[in-house]
Amino acid sequence: MKLLPKLLAATSIFAATAAIAGPPVTVTFKNQATAEATYTIVTSNETSTYANASPKPTTKRPAGTNDVYTVTSLISPDVNYANVRYKIGSKTCVFSTTFVNALQPGGYKIPQWNKTATASGGAICTATIPLPT
């Protein structure tokens, strides 16, 4: 009988956490190279992104294929982010996006998305945020 209150408490915590989640980020990685790309985790933000991704990104992405997954940060309903890193040999692409629902004078909020694509080793990396349809 003592297990039931613990299960209810755990369920309540998970439900409350899900209720404050920020808007999901859909990541679409397109490997347009002629070689296999490897999903790599280096930083703590990349670790958090992997933990919050569903389904989990595949470790190996063959040439000419895509990987699609959603990342939902549990920080706040007004914040989300995704940081991912892919390598092909000595070439690396690091992609980052952040969402902040910025509070303005008068109490209204303006959604702000930022994105970066950082290339190294001769890689060509592009990050886009598609407009809503």
Label the model's feature ranges:
Residues 13:
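Aromatic-rich surface patch/π-platform used for binding flat ligands and interfaces
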Residues 20-133:
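Intrinsically disordered, low-complexity segments enriched in small/polar residues
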Residues 16-18:
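N-terminal signal peptide c-region/cleavage motif recognized by signal peptidases
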Residues 2-10:
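Sec-dependent signal peptide recognition
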